[in-house]
Regions:
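Beta-strand-centric surfaces of beta-sandwich/beta-rich domains
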Residues: 1-283
Length: 283
């Protein structure tokens, strides 16, 4: 086993670009950790975090084979499922503060899965692509401060165990709507499924309001593995994965401002500095 820097705190020369990192073409990659940092503007960065800096993270093999392709909120939620706790991050909305987030990319069931991993030698080209485009402003992000670090968990000089496959995570469907009704999604059938994630967000709307029920149907209802209310499905996920949906945030707000933690259920709230938060902030 070896933990390797593939990129170490590289400051990006552009404020809007795609960082392409060539990955090793030998040995085995179990997990990649992508750390992105950015400095807030000279005034503040209210309602912003690193998810607003990064647009998409991808791992592409041989130019077109998609092994990983998620937006930061999706990668964040998968990390919550994989580890049962939030990803490593720093949220600090005050002026000239360095925020960061670490997005995990697992090619197996766990960080060091001996059976599911990425066999680098099977590819002639292997790229990690990080698309970023922070808004440059005094009330957003400072120019020239996007910094990227990539760490790989690898097995060197041989296979860690019997190879059974590579787990990939990709977005297969996304949409925006103001209408109510049923949304039918045809799932691709080329590969086996291990797990699916349904993510829905509307600013100012309580979890479980927009999506009320989820059904998985096989062969036109020949088999129905589940047909559950959204709230019940969320409760089952909590039991299965022991999810701790918590975020630590240093926020810059007036007394009556609203703070969106973007977690399904608030697990607790601590006011670290009442002179900053005020006594009547709405959470």
């Amino acid at each position: 086993r070896q933990i390797r820097y593939l990129l170490d705190s590289e400051v990006q020369s552009s404020d809007d670009a795609t960082k392409i990192l060539k990955l090793p073409l030998s040995n085995v990659i179990h997990t990649l950790y992508v750390k992105v940092e950015c400095t807030t503007g000279s005034t503040s960065a209210q309602d912003l975090d690193i998810d607003d800096v990064v647009d998409k993270i991808e791992v592409i093999g041989n130019g077109s084979e998609v092994l990983f392709s998620l937006t930061p909120p999706e990668a964040r939620l998968y990390g919550l499922l994989d580890f049962g706790q939030p990803i490593a991050e720093k949220v600090d909305e005050t002026a000239n503060a360095v925020m960061f987030a670490v997005y995990p990319i697992l090619f197996g069931r766990t960080e060091w899965d001996p059976n599911f991993w990425l066999p680098c030698s099977k590819f002639t080209d292997l790229e990690l692509r990080i698309k970023y485009s922070p808004t440059i402003a005094a009330t957003a992000w400072a120019t020239g401060t996007v910094t990227i670090t990539v760490i790989a968990l690898m097995t060197m000089g041989g296979d860690p165990g019997q190879y059974m496959g590579t787990l990939r995570k990709t977005t297969i469907y996304d949409f925006t709507t103001v209408a109510s009704g049923d949304e039918v999604i045809d799932l691709p059938r080329r590969l086996l499924y291990r797990r699916g994630l349904i993510y829905c967000y509307e600013s100012g709307t309580e979890d479980g309001t927009d999506i009320t029920k989820v059904k998985l149907s096989l062969n036109n209802d020949e088999r129905i593995p589940f047909n559950l209310e959204w709230a019940d499905l969320a409760d089952l996920n909590q039991l299965l994965y022991d999810i701790k949906a918590e975020r630590a945030m240093k926020i810059y707000r007036a007394d009556t401002d609203v703070v969106y933690t973007i977690t399904a259920e608030g697990q607790g709230l601590g006011l670290l500095n009442e002179t900053m938060f005020g006594g009547e902030a709405q959470i």
